[in-house]
Amino acid sequence: MRRREFVAGGIALAAGKAAFPARSLAQPAPPRIDHIIDAHCHLFIAADLPIEGFARKIMVPRSAQTSDLVARFVDYPGALEALVHAIAVQVKRAAPDMQTEIDTIDEFERDPRRKPTSAWRQDRDRQHLRSAFRLIWFSWDVFSDRPLSLTEGIALEVALEQIRLFLYQLIHEEFGKPDLTAEDREALGGLTPFQVDAIADELYSRDDLLGRYIRWALLYTRNRYELAEELDQLHGKVGQKSRIVLMTPAIVDFSKWLEDEDQLSIEEQVEVMARIACRRDGPRVHGFVGFDPLRQALYDHHRRKPGDKDPMAIVRRAIEVDRILVGNSTKTTGGFVGVKLYPPMGFQPTDNKHLPDDRFNEPAYLRSPDMGLGSQIGSKLDAALAKLYTWCRVNNVPIMAHTSHSFGPTTDYEDRADPTFWARVLKQDAFPRLRINLAHFGHFNKAVQYARPASYVDKCWEWTVGKVITGSSDAYAYADISSLGEILKTGPSRKIVECMKAFKEHFPNSDERLLYGTDWSMIAQEERFPRLLSPKPFPDVMIFFLRAVGYNDTQIERIMFGNAVRFLGLSKAEHEKFGENSTRARLEKFYAAHNLSSDWMRVFD
C-alpha cells in the first residue's frame, strides 16, 4: 500500500472503535504521554512549492486513470495544462507573502488573544473558495499572470467550462440526477453570484474526495504560524498545556527537477521559519532546511542565475547561529536543527556516477553542456552530496531523507529513495556516525498485498531500514513512522500490525531507533481526516497501534519522545559530548541571541 492511501478507518474511530485486532481491545489503556516530539511534519504554504511543475509532472499523470476530472481533458490536453497553470496562479495569489507572514506572526506574539480560532480560519477558507468560484464563473480572464494569446485564451476557456460542468454535475448527483440536460447546461451559464457561493459552500463541507482536497488545498493559503497552531491542536492538550514539546517541520527543495521555481526562495522560507522559531509559548518550532544536490551542482559549475545563492551557505545560515550584516542592520541567523533531502525527484543518496543513463529523462536541460551538467551529472551530484554529508558529520547536524517509494516523476526515480543507498553512505569511512532519519517507515508495500504478509516482510524496504538503523549501537541512524495512515483502516491495519510484529521480533532493539511523526499537513488530504480529531488526538491513535504491535510503555515513550532527543542532539549530555557542535548548544545560543529563555529544553535532560 502506498504512502498516501490513508484513513478510511477514521470512521471506525468516530464510532468509538479502533481498527486493530479484537484481542488488542482488551489491553490496558495506552500510556498517557504528555511530552511528544513530532520529528516529521511540514508547515509549507503555496508560495513555497513548485505547484505547477509538481501537478504537471507527477499528479496529473498519476491521476489519468482514476480521476473523473482529469478524464474530462483526454481530448483537450492544452486545456488541462491551462487549468493547472490557472489553479497554481490563484492558489499562490491567495497565500501570504514573506513580509505579511512575518508581520502577522509579530502581531500574534504581541497579543496572543488575536490568534484566529478554528471557526474563523474555516470561514476564511470558505471566503477564499467563494472568490475562486466567482472567478471561474464570471471573471475567467484573471486566471493568468500574463497576457494570453488567442490559442491560450481558448484553451483556458475550455478548461474552465469543463470545471463548471464538473462542479455543477457533482451538485446534481447529490440529488440523484447524474446527467445534465440541455436546460441544465443553459442554466449553468445563468447562475447568480449567490448561487455560485452556495455551490462553493456545499463542496467545502462535503466528505468526499473533492471536498477533502479542497479543504487540504486551502491550508496552503494560510500563515505558517496558523498551521503550527493546527498541528498543536491535533495532539491535544493537558489542561492548557501543549502535549507536543517540539515540532521539526521540513522545507523541501525540488524545483530544479520540476523546472518550476518556488514563489518564495529557500532563503526567504528560512527567514519566515526562523521568526516562528522565536515564539514564546506553545510547542517550539525548529525546522529542517531543504537541500537539493542538483541546485548545488548547478551553482558550483556556474549554471546559475544572477542573485542565486550558494545552497550550502543557505544551509549553514539556517543552522549556525551568528550575527550578520544585512543592509544597514544586523540579523541573527540559525534556529533550524537539520537538513531535508528528497531523493525520488531524481538522485540517489550516493553512487550517482552512472547518470545520465537511459532512465534519466527529467529534466532534459541537464544533458546540455551549456545549460546543464552534460555527461557528468552523476559525479557532480555525488560531489554536492559529499559536501553536505561532511559538513553535517562535523557539526552533528541531522538529515531527514524521504525513504518512501512515492512522489517521484517516474517509478524509476522513486527507486532512488531505496534505503540500500543509505547503507552504502554509512559504510563509507567518512560517514559512519552521520545522523540520518529514513522517513516514512512502516508501509511494508511488498508484503501487505499477500494474505499472510508477515512471511514477506524481508522483501520490503523496511527490512533494509531495520538493518541500517540497528546495525551499530553507537550510530545515529533512525526511521520515522510518519504518514502511516494504514493504521486507521481495519483490514490494512491488521496486516501492518502483523508486519510490524515480525519486524520487531527480528529487530528486537527497533524501539530505540523509531521516531514519531505526523507528516502534517500532508495528512490533512486523507479520507475522513476531520473525524480523526473528534474521538482522540492523533498521537493516542499511534500509541494504540504501537501497543498492538507489542511495544511496552517504556518503548513507546522512546518512540514518541526519547529517540528524537538523541537523534536531534537535544540533551545536555550531547552538549557535553560535542560542545558547540551540538544542536543543544546551537539552540541555547539562538535563544540567548533573541533574549529568550531556553529553560523549556530542560525536559530533554
Please provide the spans of the model-predicted regions.
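N-terminal export signals
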Residues: 5-26
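H/E-rich (His + Asp/Glu) clusters that bind or coordinate divalent metals
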Residues: 24-27, 433-605
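Histidine-centered catalytic micro-motifs
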Residues: 36-46, 400-404, 438-441
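Divalent metal-dependent hydrolysis catalytic cores, especially in the metallo-beta-lactamase
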Residues: 41, 59-110, 118, 141, ...
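Active-site gating/metal-coordination segments in enzymes
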Residues: 144-150, 154, 159-163, 167-170, ...
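Long, low-complexity, polar/charged, intrinsically disordered or flexibly structured peripheral segments
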Residues: 150-237
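Well-ordered, non-membrane alpha-helical segments in soluble/globular domains
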Residues: 193, 197, 206-234, 259-276, ...
